[in-house]
Amino acid sequence: VKTRNRKIVMPVTEVVPKKEFFDYEAKYTEGLSDEITPARFSEELTNRIQELSSEIYDILGCRGIVRVDFIVTHDGPQFLEINTIPGMTPESIIPRQAAVFGISQTDLYSMVIEDLFTMV
């Protein structure tokens, strides 16, 4: 999230599917996956994911809220995709990450809206 000319990198969320693959059914059927924030990763892995997310955000020239997804393998984090319009329902990942970071959903929206005025 880039707000008020400052970038905030949210806590990492670990998605643990209860099926072999994290497919549409696993994502949208209650009980078929767990979303754990903050992730149960080592500090080193968490920092690497946050650094990569920040670099990708800058390289792509992002503004506002995005979600950067990775798959973590034995070789480390592998970039999967960037969601430039991530879900923002109370059940979505970004609002939960913001809450863990200490930012309410209302404050999160306010920061992004205020940042839009710096573009003018």
Set out the residue ranges of the language-model regions.
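Generic C-terminus detector
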Residues: 92-95, 99-120
